[in-house]
């Protein structure tokens, strides 16, 4: 499979990831019981987006010197298209986390710890999924058509509003954990496990961590096939995907109070998934330039945001 990735690019990228995770951890470290403010979350969200943009710019400069302007332009547009796609799909992930935290009544201080581990787990799992997916696409090109059909199906579900309400207690993995593990009835600070009468017990916080990780695995099933419609280069898929999820902690606290205000987001995501799925299904018939995909994603997200703002204003005046 053709890729611009080499050892030094991967080392540089994961070096940036490690440094930014440390900065994120130290920057978001709050005093016990102190909540993350909307202002602080907004600053960190802007910082993460800025890092993603700067990485894209640095990638373009590097590729311009090594492989030429034409390929540099193409790969950079693929990166930004993939980043926007993954960032928009990640918003739905945030809403599920809100539901999980609300169901377990976790305070903000514990949410920060869970999300830190959640993002770290997502980095490992998504990296694994991406390279497995890249291998499948290289060895079995027909897999792209399965991805395309699945994305079209998911897009229709978004448009028809079939994102049904989920009762946390009905989730199978939670039932299995409660049945096969010793779970304490209450939290014990920020501990995942405690010893009682010589036996190891898991706390409800451990259940929350498992649900957060499981939800990301489920959403990765949507998002990773979608980005393979934008590019088949595993380096671009990986960097765009991880850059999008690295800022999820800040995005979570920023959107925590605005979940109900993004009224038209599911419809916008549905349209984008339909577009991406159709593009995959028509690979052998029509090759769509990457700038069209990038422009389409930007326009749909902009229209979605505009319509949501109008909807909110109408509700305020009604």
Q: Which stretches of residues belong to each language-model region?
A:
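Multi-pass alpha-helical transmembrane bundle typical of ion/small-solute transporters
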Residues: 1-318
């Amino acid at each position: 499979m053709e890729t611009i990735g080499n050892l030094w690019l991967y080392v540089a990228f994961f070096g940036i990831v490690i440094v930014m995770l440390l900065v994120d951890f130290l920057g978001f470290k709050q005093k016990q019981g102190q909540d993350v403010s909307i202002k602080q979350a907004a600053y960190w969200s802007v910082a993460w987006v800025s890092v993603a943009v700067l990485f894209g710019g640095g990638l373009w400069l590097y590729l311009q010197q090594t492989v030429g302007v034409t390929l540099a332009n193409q790969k950079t547009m693929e990166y930004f298209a993939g980043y926007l796609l993954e960032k928009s799909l990640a918003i739905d992930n945030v809403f599920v986390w809100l539901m999980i935290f609300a169901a377990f009544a976790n305070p903000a201080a514990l949410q920060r710890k869970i999300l830190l581990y959640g993002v770290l787990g997502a980095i490992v799992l998504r990296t694994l999924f991406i390279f497995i997916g890249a291998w499948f696409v290289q060895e079995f090109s027909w897999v792209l058509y399965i991805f395309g059909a699945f994305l079209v199906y998911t897009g229709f579900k978004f448009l028809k509003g079939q994102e049904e309400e989920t009762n946390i207690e009905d989730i199978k993995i939670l039932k299995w954990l409660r049945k096969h593990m010793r779970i304490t009835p209450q939290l014990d600070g920020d501990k995942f496990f405690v010893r009682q009468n010589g036996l190891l017990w898991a706390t409800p916080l451990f259940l929350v961590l498992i649900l957060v990780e499981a939800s990301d695995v489920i959403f990765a099933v949507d998002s990773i096939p979608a980005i393979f419609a934008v590019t088949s280069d595993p380096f671009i898929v990986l960097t765009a995907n991880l850059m999008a999820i690295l800022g999820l902690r800040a995005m979570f606290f920023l959107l925590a109070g605005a979940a109900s205000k993004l009224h038209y987001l599911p419809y916008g995501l549905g349209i984008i998934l339909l577009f991406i799925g159709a593009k995959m299904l028509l690979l052998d018939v029509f090759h769509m330039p990457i700038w069209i995909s990038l422009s389409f994603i930007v326009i749909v997200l902009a229209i979605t945001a505009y319509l949501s703002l109008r909807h909110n204003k109408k509700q305020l005046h009604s």
